[in-house]
């Protein structure tokens, strides 16, 4: 998949309309985590350094097509100015005369941040009229928002119809490069680690990866549906009854490929909302007591997974191994994060597929010690499923 990149564009003296993903968490009107803003800096700095006139657009939160002051892009402006060490202009509109006038005032090497795209219902509806208004703000288009690439919205897909050339930014290029290896020509041995609560959210991922990988390690709540398919009793652990037959079919197809946990950390009570857990003990996979539920993989499972991953050349990880929101039940997930860092140091390509696993590896302090942490939760998942991402397909082919 060869797409036009930022380096293929001549941006000097031109207005560059760039879609970024500044959908960051806010706390008390301030940016609580600036990871996504930092991720876009290489492309922003490249365009400004080349004398481009940069117009940045993003969404933040879910304002449902109306102006919500608490979801303004203004807190991002403060962070962006600090990180760039220069003034960034702001428009409290993202389309129309006000926004167009602000874009026109830009000089070479200056940047403008537009107000939240989703203050307009037309953005998520991919309205052609709204896309045309956005297109008036630039002479060329760059998409560096991989996290929204799975959405066919006006700023990611519709707008490209009004530009001769639409290019990928550095972050988009990096995502496509690493995730492309995972779904394409991965160096072997190639392993996948899949976790999370439910098998239903990972059906397409498993189906797409099973023929390609050497092993799939299954952890998290979804493991219990597989164990149930093997005829084991799993106490009060989460089981998707309507997926037990499917899990059994996968086990038959995958035979030697699917690796399941052999022990768990189990509890008698769990309240995820209150972040509280009752009594905890270790139990073998086949000996989970009635009334108890698995909330993390156990130490023997960690060692089993470590052995399986030893010598791997490519590993993709999507989904935590347990209830990682609670410290006591996050140790299995943190252990996997540590193993990922270890095998990266021995030369493996390691990719963390966004969402909860990205949050987990950040929390474990291992984000800098793996090859790539995807910035796209749903986007990376759909890419690994083998689906076409509208925001990527819309970019100009080389």
List PLM regions with ranges.
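Active-site loop-to-helix "anion-binding N-cap" substructures in soluble metabolic enzymes
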Residues: 1-398
């Amino acid at each position: 998949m060869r797409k036009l990149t930022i380096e293929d564009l001549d941006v000097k003296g031109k207005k560059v309309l760039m879609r970024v993903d500044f959908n960051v968490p806010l706390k008390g009107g301030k940016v609580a985590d600036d990871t996504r803003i930092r991720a876009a800096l290489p492309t922003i700095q490249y365009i400004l350094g080349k004398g481009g006139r940069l117009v940045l657009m993003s969404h933040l939160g879910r304002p449902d097509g109306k102006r919500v002051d608490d979801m303004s892009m203004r807190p991002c402006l403060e962070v962006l100015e600090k990180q760039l060490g220069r003034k960034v202009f702001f428009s409290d509109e993202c389309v129309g005369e006000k926004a167009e006038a602000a874009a026109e005032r830009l000089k070479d090497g200056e940047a403008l941040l537009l107000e939240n795209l989703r203050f307009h219902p037309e953005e998520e509806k991919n309205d052609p009229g709204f896309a045309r208004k956005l297109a008036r703000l630039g002479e060329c288009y760059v998409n560096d928002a991989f996290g929204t690439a799975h959405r066919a919205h006006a700023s990611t897909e519709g707008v490209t119809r009004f530009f001769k050339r639409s290019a990928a930014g550095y972050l988009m290029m990096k995502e496509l490069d690493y995730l492309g290896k995972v779904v394409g020509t991965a160096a072997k041995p190639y392993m996948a680690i899949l976790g999370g609560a439910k098998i239903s959210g990972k059906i397409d991922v498993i189906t797409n990866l099973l023929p390609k990988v050497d092993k799939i390690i299954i952890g998290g709540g979804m493991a219990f549906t597989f164990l149930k398919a093997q005829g084991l009793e799993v106490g009060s652990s989460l089981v998707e009854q309507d997926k037990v037959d499917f899990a059994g079919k996968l086990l038959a197809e995958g035979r030697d490929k699917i690796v399941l946990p052999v022990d768990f950390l189990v509890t008698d009570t769990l309240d995820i909302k209150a972040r509280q857990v009752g009594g905890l003990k270790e139990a073998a996979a086949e000996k989970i007591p009635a009334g108890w539920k698995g909330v993390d993989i156990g130490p023997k499972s960690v060692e089993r997974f470590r052995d399986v991953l030893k010598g791997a050349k490519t590993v993709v990880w999507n989904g935590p191994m347990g209830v990682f929101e609670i410290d006591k039940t996050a140790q299995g997930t943190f252990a996997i994060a540590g193993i990922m860092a270890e095998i990266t140091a021995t030369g493996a390509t390691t990719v963390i597929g966004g969402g909860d696993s990205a949050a987990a590896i950040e929390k474990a302090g291992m984000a800098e010690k793996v090859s790539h942490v995807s910035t796209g939760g749903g986007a990376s998942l759909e890419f690994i499923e083998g689906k076409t991402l509208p925001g990527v397909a819309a970019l100009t082919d080389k």
